[in-house]
């Protein structure tokens, strides 16, 4: 019988604040403000913010950038025992990468009602066909994360 996993939530808000700071960096470049950090053993091993426009790469979501950086940092494509903090609920592309990289837990801020696949448009991580289970939790600093996104799009609409 599997032992229940003990989850340390004591630094969730601290790591989400790091992700929010990265989201602000992306916003300053005109990117949709989403930031992500990947943590293993209490240390940040990967950071990223959305950069598909500036990087001419449609896959350059914050989660992708952070996971790629983390994999390089630890010289391993698998990241067991790690937690991904991201300011917006992951999409299907990012959720697939999260499973393939064996991330243990995802903590996100704001819901993504149109493309979020963790809870909003389906519960991807609970699907029986997956060979890896990912724990997930939403709403951590959700109001701040949502406000940053809302303000970004409000300002973008005002410019057009």
Please place each PLM-identified region on the residue numbering.
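Zinc-dependent deaminase
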Residues: 1-26, 90-160
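A short, polar/charged loop-to-alpha-helix boundary motif
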Residues: 54-65
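Short beta->alpha transition motifs characteristic of CBS
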Residues: 45-52
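Short, basic and Ser/Thr-rich N-terminal targeting/leader segments
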Residues: 30-34, 80
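Short beta-strand scaffold segments in enzyme catalytic cores
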Residues: 34-42
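A cytosolic small-molecule/anion-sensing beta-strand core signal
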Residues: 40-41, 68, 80
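Immediate flanking context of iron-sulfur cluster ligation sites
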Residues: 76-88
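Small-residue (primarily alanine) positions within well-ordered alpha-helices
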Residues: 19, 23-26, 36, 46, ...
């Amino acid at each position: 019988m599997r032992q229940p996993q003990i989850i340390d939530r004591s630094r969730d808000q601290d790591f989400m604040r790091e992700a929010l700071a990265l989201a602000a960096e992306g916003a300053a470049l005109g990117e949709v403000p989403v930031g992500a950090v990947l943590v293993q053993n209490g240390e940040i091993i990967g950071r990223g913010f959305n950069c598909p426009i500036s990087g001419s790469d449609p896959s350059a979501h914050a989660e992708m950038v952070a996971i790629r950086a983390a994999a390089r940092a630890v010289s391993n494509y698998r990241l067991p025992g790690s937690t991904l903090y991201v300011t917006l609920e992951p999409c299907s592309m990012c959720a697939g990468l999260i499973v393939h990289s064996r991330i243990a837990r995802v903590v996100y801020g704001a819901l993504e009602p149109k493309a979020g696949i963790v809870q909003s448009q389906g519960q991807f991580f609970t699907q029986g066909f997956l060979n890896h289970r990912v724990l997930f939790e939403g709403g951590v600093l959700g109001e701040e994360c949502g406000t940053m996104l809302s303000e970004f799009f409000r300002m973008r609409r005002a410019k057009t």
